[in-house]
Each structure stands twice: as C-alpha cells, then as structure tokens.
C-alpha cells in the first residue's frame, strides 16, 4: 500500500459522505489526529481498524488495501 494514495482514498470517500475527520474517527473509535495522519500519508491504521474503516466507508477491505 502506498500511504499517500491510501490517504487520498480515505479523504475522498470521507468528504463524499460529508463527514469531518472527527466524525469518521468517532465511528471507528480512533482519534481525529489518527485520521489526519492517514489522510496526509503519514501512516496506516492498525490492522484491527481496517475492517471497521471499510465498513463505515462502505467499501471492501480489498479496495482499501489496493488504494
């Protein structure tokens, strides 16, 4: 996974849903700072967060992993 592409993917879907970083963070029980780091390409979510993230964004885990 490319962290920059991953971050852009997450940010695009989040914005399409009209959510703030804080709203997405609350839905998956992480901090808004974590979401910010991901979206800026500075890291990835913990493996245990990938499935909940995919679920709330309504995408497959595969789509997230390929982003």
Predicted regions located by residue number:
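Short, flexible micro-motifs
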Residues: 10, 44-46
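Residues in the recognition helix of alpha-helical DNA-binding motifs
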Residues: 13, 27, 38, 67
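Short alpha-helical DNA-recognition segment
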Residues: 18-37, 43, 52, 56
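A short, Lys/Arg-rich alpha-helix, primarily the initiator
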Residues: 1-16
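DNA major-groove recognition helix of helix-turn-helix/homeodomain DNA-binding modules
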Residues: 48-63
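Residues that cap or flank secondary-structure elements
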Residues: 2, 41-42
């Amino acid at each position: 996974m490319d962290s920059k592409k991953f971050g852009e993917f997450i940010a695009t879907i989040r914005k399409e849903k009209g959510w703030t970083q804080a709203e997405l963070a609350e839905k998956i029980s992480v901090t808004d700072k974590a979401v910010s780091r991901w979206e800026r390409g500075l890291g990835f979510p913990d493996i245990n967060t990938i499935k909940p993230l995919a679920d709330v964004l309504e995408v497959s885990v595969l789509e997230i992993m390929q982003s």
